[in-house]
Amino acid sequence: IGSKYDSANIESGTSKLTPYSTVTDKIKSASCTYKTIGDIVIVSATVKMNAVSLAGNSMCPLIDLPYKCISEDNVFCVGISNLGKLFKFAIPKNNTWLQFSTQDKTAYTFADGEQINVICLYKIK
């Protein structure tokens, strides 16, 4: 475990994010890297999609973030795909889920292998 911390006591690591059972056919893979700095974690996630459509009001939940979000409110971040589409990401309070939908709430069809990147910060202590 000592190799996960640097001299400033900042923990770094990687984590595989698991698509929730209702969206396993939509997501090819999902993972993240993270750093903890005091009571905050910075998560940089990458989601690779299959060639599927997402309805305008649909959410794609991923589970297994490295730390539970203990913020008083849900945390929101914006992600972008390699094709330029924007996505709204949310981490519900008291949870280890990262979920996303299209930012403009319109339906969207992903290209096979389209990649979404997002960086979120949230409170863990």
Where are these regions (language model features)?
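Beta-rich globular "head" domains
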Residues: K26-N82, I119-C120
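Nucleic-acid endonuclease domains
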Residues: P19-K26, A30, S58, Q99-T102, ...
